């Protein structure tokens, strides 16, 4: 919820800056004649939509016409030899147990005060809380990994069981089909035998009837 509020605040802040920001035509470090500048600013029309970039930026002491002296910071920056500056490569691994925080090196130089003791205790509490959160997070990840492994093993077992059941069902269906085929063959053979028997009986009955009719006519 706090993250959502912060994002909404940043969006509102950015929108307000974009709508209300106006870029001046000229910037100066030290103010000159305040009355003249205010009067000029009041007479100057403020652009409504178009934002214009100033033509120049004047630093105090840089121009000969400026009544202000050159700042000493610029002299220090210009007089510094770039060759004396060097960049130190940071270490690849940062271990909190060996060097917890940089401000702990100053404990021996600064005298112990109640505020420093309170800050130190709060730092220890934060480190303990951070380490406990890391331990809980690692334990949660291990438990999640174990549960996922158990679920994958169970899925594999269920798949194997389903395959075995499918093979058993296929074998039983094959046996039943073979039995049905044999039964059909037996029924067809019995039907053929019955047809032959009926034809023989019908032939005998017809011959006997014709013979009786001929004998009766002879009388």
Swiss-Prot record:
Main location: mitochondrion
Keyword Nucleotide-binding: no
Record has Transmembrane as a keyword: yes
Topology in the lipid bilayer: Single-pass type IV membrane protein
Pfam (any one): Miff
Membrane topology (Cytoplasmic): 1-199
Membrane topology, Extracellular segments: 218-219
Key words, A-Z: Coiled coil, Cytoplasmic vesicle, Membrane, Mitochondrion, Mitochondrion outer membrane, Peroxisome, Synapse, Transmembrane, Transmembrane helix
Any Gene Ontology biological process: protein targeting to mitochondrion
GO molecular function: protein homodimerization activity
InterPro entries documented for this protein: Mff-like_dom, Mff/Tango-11
Cell compartment(s), UniProt: Mitochondrion outer membrane; Peroxisome; Cytoplasmic vesicle, Secretory vesicle, Synaptic vesicle
Transmembrane segments: 200-217
One cellular component term from this protein's GO annotations in UniProt: mitochondrial outer membrane
Physiological role: Plays a role in mitochondrial and peroxisomal fission. Promotes the recruitment and association of the fission mediator dynamin-related protein 1 (DNM1L) to the mitochondrial surface.
Family: Belongs to the Tango11 family.
Protein name in UniProt: Mitochondrial fission factor homolog A
Organism: Xenopus laevis
């Amino acid at each position: 919820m706090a993250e959502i509020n912060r994002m909404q605040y940043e969006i509102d802040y950015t929108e307000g800056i974009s709508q209300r920001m106006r870029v001046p035509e000229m910037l100066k470090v030290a103010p000159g004649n305040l009355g003249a500048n205010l009067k000029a600013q009041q007479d100057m029309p403020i652009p409504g939509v178009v934002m214009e970039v100033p033509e120049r930026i004047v630093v105090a002491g840089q121009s000969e016409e400026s009544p202000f002296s050159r700042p000493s910071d610029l002299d220090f920056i210009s007089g510094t030899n770039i060759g004396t500056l060097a960049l130190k490569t940071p270490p690849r691994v940062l271990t909190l147990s060996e060097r917890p925080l940089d401000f702990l090196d100053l404990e021996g130089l600064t005298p112990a005060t109640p505020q420093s003791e309170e800050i130190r205790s709060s730092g220890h509490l934060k480190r303990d809380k951070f380490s406990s959160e890391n331990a809980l997070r690692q334990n949660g990840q291990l438990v999640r990994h174990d549960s996922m492994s158990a679920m994958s093993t169970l899925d594999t077992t269920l798949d194997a069981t389903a395959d075995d059941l499918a093979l058993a069902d296929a074998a039983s269906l094959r046996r039943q089909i073979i039995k049905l085929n044999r039964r059909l063959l037996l029924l067809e053979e019995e039907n053929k035998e019955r047809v032959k028997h009926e034809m023989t009986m019908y032939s005998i009955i017809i011959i006997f009837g014709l013979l009786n009719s001929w004998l009766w006519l002879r009388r």
